[in-house]
Design a protein with these regions (language model features):
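Non-catalytic interaction/assembly regions
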Residues: 5-10, 23
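Long, terminal "pre-/pro-" and other extracytoplasmic accessory regions
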Residues: 1-7, 116, 121
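N-terminal segment of the canonical double-stranded RNA-binding domain
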Residues: 14-102, 114
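Generic detector of isolated residues embedded in canonical secondary-structure elements
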Residues: 13-14, 107
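Ampiphathic alpha-helical segments that act as solvent-exposed interaction surfaces
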Residues: 101-121
Length: 121
């Protein structure tokens, strides 16, 4: 059974902090190009990127983390098993696969991201 998203964040604090910093940096970059009111920008920056936000992203759309890991030389690929069963998915990280198969793409992505947290930590 996979860990809860909040457990992943707690188990890999160094990775969590690096990821939080990455998303905050991206938020700041987007504000520099955005015409949003200054008070809105300040409010969003003061909130930062919470563990709850990261946990929701991990559960609902784990591929949002792929760019973070790419920049840290942890490259995730999610593939279909075209040789044995094309209805199954598996992942590779830096060309290596754990040999685990998934019936749906999102659980496969989540497992890959969890492994990437471990590697980044």
């Amino acid at each position: 059974m996979p860990k809860l998203a909040i457990e992943v964040l707690n188990d890999y604090p160094l990775a969590t902090e690096a990821i939080r910093d990455w998303f905050l940096k991206k938020m700041i970059e987007s504000f520099e190009q955005d015409n949003a009111p200054e008070d809105f920008k300040k409010q969003m920056l003061s909130r930062g990127v919470s563990d709850i936000t990261l946990a929701i992203m991990l559960d609902q759309s784990p591929r949002n983390f792929f760019d973070v890991f790419d920049e840290n030389k942890i490259v995730i690929e999610v593939l279909r098993d075209t040789d044995i069963n094309p209805d199954l998915f598996y992942y590779k990280i830096n060309g290596k696969t754990p040999g685990t198969f998934f019936e749906q793409r999102i659980p496969c992505e989540r497992a890959a991201v969890e492994k990437a947290f471990e590697l980044l930590n």
